[in-house]
């Protein structure tokens, strides 16, 4: 998932580069990937056809968690690495995560950063593809939402994961056009180096309230930040964080074969039925009560009263991530719900934004 954006500079970012403290490694509960148990980097090494020997990916038992308490300190890691001086990470895993016959290809990619690029759930990193554009200038960085918790997929604070869909389309002249960065990333092999910038972003950070209701609206690779949310909530055990609220994910995709992390999500939901609700909107396979294609807004409409009542509560937070086209349908749905409750959505969403309870990142 990629979008190009200007990156603002925030104060207090550099402190996280030098401050490090030893903490207990987070215990991973029910850790799995593509339905299999995951305990260390060696799992990913064994899954990747071109992976180097597992010894290359041994987990260091001394954990440095630079970003763990960032929000409590009032510090959010931002712009630690810039385009002029990126961090050089390495790909250690790159595998397809869509089913057979899926339209398009999406990969789960893991990079090492050896604790040098701390980040928080909801942030993004920049990737600079090698080479130059048609004008001979270096390629611009692309931003990708992070799909792993701050501790990475192995809980050792040394990796960062992305969900990347390969961009390919035919233009008006019948020429095949390939996205520069997405194709570069999807073609990486374990051991390949990659230029990383960031982290960036404060819009999609998780709320600190551990009893909050968190509603997540995602399409396609927009699932990335919510995978990081959910893994922090339900797969890691922390002395200072225990989620006991409600997480409700609406995931919109065209076909069942494009449900990213399906086994992972359903396993978490089954293990946490009182704290995690999961609803799919599969547009090419499902219809609503009116016989219309099932998009996220159609699924939300089925829970209109419940959804409305939830967002009236001060500890309910709504997050939206995915293709920009999802916004119009959800906007219309919310306007209809607000009207049925005697008000306007413009007034409601204005209040939600003021209270920092409505968060949108689309591309």
Swiss-Prot record:
Top-rank taxon, per record: Eukaryota
Cofactor section: FAD
Residues the record lists as binding NADP(+): 145, 165, 221, 253-254, 283-284, 293, 322-323, 361
UniProt-annotated binding residues for FAD: 142-145, 163-165, 169, 180-182, 221
Annotated catalysed reactions: 2 reduced [2Fe-2S]-[ferredoxin] + NADP(+) + H(+) = 2 oxidized [2Fe-2S]-[ferredoxin] + NADPH
Keyword Membrane in annotation: yes
Enzyme nomenclature, EC number: 1.18.1.2
Cross-referenced InterPro entries: FAD-bd_FR_type, Flavoprot_Pyr_Nucl_cyt_Rdtase, FNR, FNR_nucleotide-bd, FNR_plant_Cyanobacteria, OxRdtase_FAD/NAD-bd, Riboflavin_synthase-like_b-brl
Topology class, membrane: Peripheral membrane protein
Localization per Swiss-Prot or TrEMBL: Plastid, Cyanelle stroma; Plastid, Cyanelle thylakoid membrane
Family matches, as CDD domains: CYPOR_like_FNR (cd06208)
GO CC term (a single one): cyanelle thylakoid membrane
A GO molecular-function descriptor: ferredoxin-NADP+ reductase activity
Similarity annotation: Belongs to the ferredoxin--NADP reductase type 1 family.
Stated role: May play a key role in regulating the relative amounts of cyclic and non-cyclic electron flow to meet the demands of the plant for ATP and reducing power.
Stated name of the protein: Ferredoxin--NADP reductase, cyanelle
Species: Cyanophora paradoxa
Lineage of the species this protein comes from: Eukaryota, Glaucocystophyceae, Cyanophoraceae, Cyanophora
């Amino acid at each position: 998932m990629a979008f190009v954006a200007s990156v603002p500079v925030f104060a207090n970012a550099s402190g996280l580069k030098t401050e490090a403290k030893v903490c207990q490694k987070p215990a991973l509960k029910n850790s799995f990937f593509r339905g299999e148990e995951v305990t260390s980097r060696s799992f990913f090494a064994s899954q990747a056809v071109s992976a180097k020997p597992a010894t290359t990916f041994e987990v260091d038992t001394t954990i440095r968690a630079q970003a763990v308490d960032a929000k409590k300190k009032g510090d959010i890691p931002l712009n630690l690495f810039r385009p002029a001086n990126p961090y050089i990470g390495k790909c250690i895993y790159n595998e397809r995560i869509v089913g057979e016959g899926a339209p398009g290809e999406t990969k789960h990619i893991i990079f090492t950063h050896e604790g040098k690029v701390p980040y928080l759930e909801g942030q993004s990193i920049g990737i600079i593809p090698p080479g130059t554009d048609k004008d001979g200038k270096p390629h611009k960085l692309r931003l990708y939402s992070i799909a792993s918790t701050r501790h990475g997929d192995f809980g050792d604070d040394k990796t960062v994961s992305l969900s990347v869909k390969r961009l390919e389309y035919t233009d008006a002249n019948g020429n095949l056009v390939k996205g520069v960065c997405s194709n570069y990333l999807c073609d990486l092999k374990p051991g390949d180096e990659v230029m990383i910038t960031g982290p960036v972003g404060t819009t999609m950070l998780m709320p600190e309230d551990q009893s909050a209701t968190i509603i997540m609206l995602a399409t396609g690779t927009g699932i990335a930040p919510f995978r990081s949310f959910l893994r922090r909530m339900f797969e890691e055990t922390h002395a200072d964080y225990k989620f006991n609220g409600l997480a409700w994910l609406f995931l919109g995709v065209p076909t069942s074969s494009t449900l990213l992390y399906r086994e992972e999500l359903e396993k978490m939901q089954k293990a946490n039925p009182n704290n995690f609700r999961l609803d799919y909107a599969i547009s090419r396979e499902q219809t609503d009560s009116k016989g219309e294609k099932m998009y996220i807004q159609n699924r939300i409409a089925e829970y209109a009263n419940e959804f409305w009542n939830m967002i009236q509560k001060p500890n309910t937070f709504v997050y939206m991530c995915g293709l920009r086209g999802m916004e119009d349908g959800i906007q219309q749905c919310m306007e209809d719900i607000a009207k049925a409750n005697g008000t306007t959505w413009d007034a409601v969403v204005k209040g939600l934004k003021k209270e920092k309870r409505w968060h949108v990142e689309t591309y």
